[in-house]
Amino acid sequence: MATRAESEVRVTILFGILQQLMTTRQNKLFANLSITSSQFGLLMHFTHNPIRSWLVSELAKVMEMNQPGITKVVTQLVDKGLLLATPDTSDGRKKHLKITDKGLKTCSKTMNFFEPDIQNIYSSFANDELSELEQRLEKLMTWLDTNRDDIKGL
């Protein structure tokens, strides 16, 4: 039987492998679309609360990207009409960003495109196994989100 430390290392290795396998799958799927995985990831962030506007600096923080990187993706999405950029009334350098109806539809169409592969990935899981996996991943996601700066060894 593995020790807790051995299990923690193994789970971390498995997450690395899963991340690579899922990234490869996503890249193959996105090759057929007019939007990139980075654009989709950012656009999906807006779908959680479509009426909220965001500043680039806020997005950079929550998406854990540098400001030039997020600005590039935002510009691409604005150019495609998927985000709307409205200048700040007190500081014209700042732009308030909101998802457009076209952006919401693009997210929905993209998720529909992914649905067959998503179902394929989890087809070998019983409903209770999938529910348990979801609960455990939610717990891990919440911990990682809450403890973004609590990195031991730095």
What is the meaning of each model-derived region?
Residues 56, 74-75:
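Short, hydrophobic-biased segments on the C-terminal half of alpha helices
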Residues 1-33, 80:
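N-terminal leader segment of winged-helix/HTH proteins
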Residues 25-66:
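N-terminal helix-turn-helix DNA-binding core of bacterial DNA-binding proteins
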Residues 15-18, 22, 63, 106, ...:
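Alpha-helical linker/hinge and terminal dimerization helices associated
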Residues 23, 75-135:
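Charged, amphipathic alpha-helical coiled-coil/dimerization segments
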Residues 1-2, 8-9, 19-21, 58, ...:
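Recognition helices and adjacent regulatory flanks at domain boundaries
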Residues 1-3, 127-154:
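C-terminal regulatory/oligomerization modules of transcriptional regulators
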